[in-house]
A protein has these predicted regions:
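Phosphate-binding/switch loop-helix module in NTP-utilizing enzymes
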Residues: 103-140
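Acidic, Mg2+-coordinating active-site environments of NTP-dependent enzymes
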Residues: 108, 128-131, 135, 151-257, ...
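C-terminal helical cap/extension that packs against the catalytic core
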Residues: 194-204, 209-213, 326-332, 338, ...
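N-terminal phosphate/diphosphate-binding loop that engages ATP/GTP or pyrophosphate donors
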Residues: 34-35, 39-41, 51-103
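Short functional linear segments
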Residues: 1-45, 52-54, 58-63, 70
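Nucleotide phosphate-binding/pyrophosphate-handling subdomain across enzymes
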Residues: 37-39, 131-134, 142-155, 159-160, ...
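Short internal beta-strands
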Residues: 70, 187-192, 358-361, 380-388
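Active-site-proximal loop/hinge segments that shape catalytic or ion-binding/gating pockets
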Residues: 440
Length: 452
């Protein structure tokens, strides 16, 4: 498997001309593969688009369908970005695809994401599948993936402030960019949003004549606790963390025509119930409008078997895990913006109110204090690390200083392994046995490399 492809070399900066004309020109030279792919579902949003895509992928696979999928970024291997009929693209085919792109594009400048998108569209156009799931890289309107003219469905997940230097200073302007994936007369599933965000999306939908299926209006998905209640917020059982919600909790999906209970999804956190709702809503449209045969049992199986790494992932083995006592736990999460921090902190509050150790690293454009403020009551020790796989990483000294400014005990560490072995395991803190690694998906990549 390939960590980074041989071509193109990263430009080190984003191009100034955010236009789709360059992408359209490149694709034209390659025979317009974007017009020859299996039916496409296009997914945008600030948070939750990868999880929503994964839920859909596993649900549809459970129903017997072949699914192509394109996501970004990758954690360890570049091949992770391109799933061809259920399997990661193999090294030889990926190499050939990129060589084909390079030959057609010649010496014209191209970003890594643009090249990956073109390679994905090429391979999807050459392999049979029933549906193609495509995740937007950033924004929507001018994203390289938005050369798809005729998706059968679009989805917009949770919207929040992120990448403001590119997408705009307010959630409303960002929503407008996300709405750019809406297409004329193509239905759009929208996660529950703040009122001003939903209003913006509705205005764009009117202009596009795009029928909306809105969370909180046409559908709703929420956790339902059974009569059995658990006094504490989490149970320790055989050294395995089990959330209190598993003790009798389920989720219920409701629309104008149905109200169905499902088990909680495999991905942890209440926010994943919303993402699962996005996927169920989308599947109901696929069944009702396009004739896909997706039953309740397929949804149940898909939700329970979905795997999407670094989303509140409990890591059970590896070099670093072997350092921990048996009753300790380590969770890995790619949360990197303020909204992601908020929902992650809610999960910590619900399950580990006694406190956690945090290993934290971010890229330079992130507000350290704003992110960490959500976790202030729970962090007993913060280990600041530099994100090694990201050239634009924040210096550990700045992280430590930002944490100290808001009253969090923080130290600088050379690596994740150094943080665990030389600091966390030697910290004199009673009854805290949980480590959370977060701040960047690139930090999750560093962990995967160190943990082997």
């Amino acid at each position: 498997m390939i960590y980074m492809p041989h071509w193109p070399k990263p430009l080190g900066r984003r191009p100034k001309d955010f236009s789709l004309e360059r992408m359209k020109s490149f694709l034209s030279k390659l025979g317009n593969p974007e017009k020859k792919m299996p039916p496409a579902i296009h997914i945008a949003g600030t948070n939750g688009k990868g999880s929503t895509l994964s839920f859909m992928r596993y649900i549809m696979q459970s129903a017997g369908y072949k699914v192509h999928a394109y996501t970004s970024p990758h954690l360890v291997n570049f091949n992770e970005r391109i799933v061809v009929a259920g399997s990661h693209v193999d090294d030889n085919e990926l190499y050939s695809l990129l060589e084909e792109c390079r030959s057609a594009i010649a010496d014209q400048p191209i970003t890594l994401f643009e090249a990956a998108t073109i390679a994905a569209f090429l391979v999807f156009s050459r392999h049979e599948a029933d549906v193609t799931l495509i995740e937007v890289g950033m924004g929507g309107r001018l994203d390289a993936t938005n050369v798809i003219d005729n998706p059968i469905l679009t989805i917009i997940t949770s919207i929040a402030l992120d990448h403001m230097e590119y997408l705009g200073p307010t959630v409303e302007t960002i929503a407008g960019e996300k709405a750019g994936i809406m297409k004329h007369n193509v239905p759009c599933v929208i996660a529950s949003q703040e009122k001003s965000i939903m209003n913006t999306l509705e205005q764009y939908a009117v202009n596009k004549k795009s029928p909306l299926y809105r969370g909180g209006f046409e559908w709703n998905c929420s956790k339902q606790l059974s009569v059995i209640q658990v006094a504490n917020t989490g149970i320790q059982q055989k050294n395995e963390w089990i959330p209190a919600s598993c003790a009798g909790a389920r989720m219920i999906f409701q629309s104008a025509i149905q109200s169905i209970e499902f088990p909680l999804p495999s991905l942890k956190g209440d926010h994943q119930i919303i993402n699962a709702g996005n996927a169920i809503a989308a599947c109901s449209i696929l069944s009702g409008k396009y004739g896909f045969d997706i039953g309740e049992e397929d949804i149940t199986s898909g939700l329970q078997h979905t795997y999407w790494p670094a989303r509140l992932e409990l890591i059970k083995e590896g070099n670093l895990i072997s350092l921990l006592p048996k009753d300790w736990q380590l969770f890995l999460d790619g949360a990197h913006n303020n909204d992601g921090a908020r929902v992650l902190a809610d999960w910590v509050k619900d399950n580990f109110a006694e406190g956690i150790y945090m290993i934290f690293g971010v890229t330079r454009n992130r507000n350290v204090e704003e992110f960490l403020e959500h976790f202030k009551p729970y962090i007993k020790l913060l280990c600041a690390v530099c994100v090694k796989s990201e050239p634009k990483a924040t210096d550990t000294g700045l992280i430590r200083e930002g944490a100290n400014n808001i009253g969090i005990n923080a130290i600088e560490c050379e690596s994740i392994g150094d943080a665990i072995l030389n600091h966390i395991l030697k910290a004199p803190i009673q009854n805290v046995k949980t480590i959370l690694i977060c701040g960047s998906l690139f930090l999750a990549r560093d962990f995967a490399m160190e943990n082997n």
